[in-house]
Amino acid sequence: MPNIEELKQRQEKIRNFSIIAHIDHGKSTLADRILEKTETVSSREMQAQLLDSMDLERERGITIKLNAIELNYKAKDGETYIFHLIDTPGHVDFTYEVSRSLAACEGAILVVDAAQGIEAQTLANVYLALDNDLEILPVINKIDLPAADPERVRTEIEDVIGLDASEAVLASAKAGIGIEEILEQIVEKVPAPQGDVEAPLQALIFDSVYDAYRGVILQVRVVNGMVKTGDKIQMMSNGKTFDVTEVGIFTPKAVGRDYLATGDVGYVAASIKTVADTRVGDTVTLADNPAAEPLHGYKQMNPMVFAGLYPIESNKYNDLREALEKLQLNDASLQFEPETSQALGFGFRCGFLGLLHMDVIQERLEREFNIDLIMTAPSVVYHVNTTDGEMLEVSNPSEFPDPTRIDAIEEPYVKAQIMVPQEYVGAVMELAQRKRGDFETMEYIDDNRVNVIYQIPLAEIVFDFFDKLKSSTRGYASFDYELSEYRRSQLVKMDILLNGDKVDALSFIVHREFAYERGKLIVDKLKKIIPRQQFEVPIQAAIGQKIVARTDIKALRKNVLAKCYGGDVSRKRKLLEKQKAGKKRMKAIGSVEVPQEAFLSVLSMDEDEK
């Protein structure tokens, strides 16, 4: 065990940093190069996007989870420094993950694509880094691209963000250019962690994973004090205590250590069996010498998008609950509560940060836990003011009060920043208007790129705004949004009736102006998707008691006259009457099978299909 002096000297050599960038600006590739350069990973083990360990991340080419890795780097001054690289996601839905990783760092490498320049999410993440008082090192990446224009990007960084980019490293992570300069800048510019080894332990939990054998494994950043195997630790939020069975670091693989001291980033295993005992953002301290107060944690993220998740096989309900609990462990922004639906049985109402987050959770449940799911249309949290003066928060359309009790409905608006090349500004404005957006302002970033700011209802963004934006700008637009306010809107709840029965899972909220078109579109779409039954099935869209659209699925009929060669007409009529009576009886008691696509079709309602 090293003495206090040695620990303090070691602390001087620690550098904690993360890499922030917009999607596809080369963040994961740069992380790969840094791992190679510091010989953390042998070339035999190297694979592209090494830190994106989830299959999903590699397939989509995005980073979803944060990862923390320890590297040793021998600098030009002859000293060996300990780097902790904390990898962060770049997508708008995972801003929460970014804020968590930045809270564990003292510096951030800002990667900007030399051809594309600054994008909306680059800005969003830089502001997060500035909030955390991080030292920001700009890196202009992909300088080997034919379209690269590093000098333009340099002035952009200075003008738009206001950072001094005179010493920005010009690099190409793919070709391995400029990596050493980046590492030297980390040594020189990123401050060593502050904190006192002799103070009581304070460690911030910034992530956790569940291991079937060792229980919950916490990923922590030690801010003060130290922790070693055999210590008794205590969670500061709920006072529960655990015995530490193992501490260690990640060099992508987990490697056991004797202790973690101030400034270290690593993991702690303490046979924590119940998932609910640990919360990301909580502070760990020692039970026999606790810290006076917890660390400043993270702000709790509120979900913006809600959807129902139902197991296709109803006996998988408990498996789904366990799976959601395990996912919640290292994704603290996921929230869920049980709900039932007449159409779909038992399931959960889940809250997500955005659509990509929802998509990723659904896919992780299906892949990692083998649960087949039906997902209902996503909705947002509405504020419903009733006639007797109550204000209800409703996220599930089927829980809306009776229309006669509603005085007014308010819906959330977001402030959307859309960065786009000049020639597409018209297309973006048209899309935003169509989505009921209110124009706020427009700023020119350089000669060619414009930042357009709109106030748009979140419910309109939830559907397919992002895909539409990408297709109307050939993929050049980038987009970031934050919740701004609630506003009164003319909203109504639309129910879909099959064979006269409401299907609660197909209900949705729509603006009165678009109600008729939306209703017509959905009934036509359902007609194509729901298979024909033995009896005629009417599909209706209704607002309250008023039917606004209807279509019928024609019945299948068996040719009952086939075995009746020639024969009397009354014989034929008798067979047809018998069939008719059978169909009538069937219709009275028959239920309609609704395939999964029907629920999804409500989501992908496309104005362009009109």
Curated annotation (Swiss-Prot):
<dbReference type="InterPro" id="IPR000640">
    <property type="entry name" value="EFG_V-like"/>
</dbReference>
<feature type="domain" description="tr-type G">
    <location>
        <begin position="12"/>
        <end position="194"/>
    </location>
</feature>
<dbReference type="InterPro" id="IPR031157">
    <property type="entry name" value="G_TR_CS"/>
</dbReference>
<dbReference type="InterPro" id="IPR013842">
    <property type="entry name" value="LepA_CTD"/>
</dbReference>
<dbReference type="InterPro" id="IPR006297">
    <property type="entry name" value="EF-4"/>
</dbReference>
<keyword id="KW-0547">Nucleotide-binding</keyword>
<dbReference type="Pfam" id="PF06421">
    <property type="entry name" value="LepA_C"/>
</dbReference>
<feature type="binding site">
    <location>
        <begin position="24"/>
        <end position="29"/>
    </location>
    <ligand>
        <name>GTP</name>
    </ligand>
</feature>
<dbReference type="Pfam" id="PF00009">
    <property type="entry name" value="GTP_EFTU"/>
</dbReference>
<dbReference type="InterPro" id="IPR004161">
    <property type="entry name" value="EFTu-like_2"/>
</dbReference>
<dbReference type="InterPro" id="IPR027417">
    <property type="entry name" value="P-loop_NTPase"/>
</dbReference>
<comment type="function">
    <text>Required for accurate and efficient protein synthesis under certain stress conditions. May act as a fidelity factor of the translation reaction, by catalyzing a one-codon backward translocation of tRNAs on improperly translocated ribosomes. Back-translocation proceeds from a post-translocation (POST) complex to a pre-translocation (PRE) complex, thus giving elongation factor G a second chance to translocate the tRNAs correctly. Binds to ribosomes in a GTP-dependent manner.</text>
</comment>
<dbReference type="GO" id="GO:0005525">
    <property type="term" value="F:GTP binding"/>
</dbReference>
<dbReference type="GO" id="GO:0003746">
    <property type="term" value="F:translation elongation factor activity"/>
</dbReference>
<feature type="binding site">
    <location>
        <begin position="141"/>
        <end position="144"/>
    </location>
    <ligand>
        <name>GTP</name>
    </ligand>
</feature>
<dbReference type="GO" id="GO:0043022">
    <property type="term" value="F:ribosome binding"/>
</dbReference>
<keyword id="KW-0342">GTP-binding</keyword>
<comment type="similarity">
    <text>Belongs to the TRAFAC class translation factor GTPase superfamily. Classic translation factor GTPase family. LepA subfamily.</text>
</comment>
<keyword id="KW-0378">Hydrolase</keyword>
<dbReference type="InterPro" id="IPR035654">
    <property type="entry name" value="LepA_IV"/>
</dbReference>
<dbReference type="Pfam" id="PF03144">
    <property type="entry name" value="GTP_EFTU_D2"/>
</dbReference>
<protein>
    <recommendedName>
        <fullName>Elongation factor 4</fullName>
        <ecNumber>3.6.5.n1</ecNumber>
    </recommendedName>
</protein>
<dbReference type="InterPro" id="IPR038363">
    <property type="entry name" value="LepA_C_sf"/>
</dbReference>
<dbReference type="InterPro" id="IPR005225">
    <property type="entry name" value="Small_GTP-bd"/>
</dbReference>
<keyword id="KW-0648">Protein biosynthesis</keyword>
<keyword id="KW-0472">Membrane</keyword>
<dbReference type="InterPro" id="IPR000795">
    <property type="entry name" value="T_Tr_GTP-bd_dom"/>
</dbReference>
<dbReference type="InterPro" id="IPR035647">
    <property type="entry name" value="EFG_III/V"/>
</dbReference>
<dbReference type="Pfam" id="PF00679">
    <property type="entry name" value="EFG_C"/>
</dbReference>
<keyword id="KW-1003">Cell membrane</keyword>
<dbReference type="GO" id="GO:0045727">
    <property type="term" value="P:positive regulation of translation"/>
</dbReference>
<dbReference type="GO" id="GO:0005886">
    <property type="term" value="C:plasma membrane"/>
</dbReference>
<dbReference type="GO" id="GO:0003924">
    <property type="term" value="F:GTPase activity"/>
</dbReference>
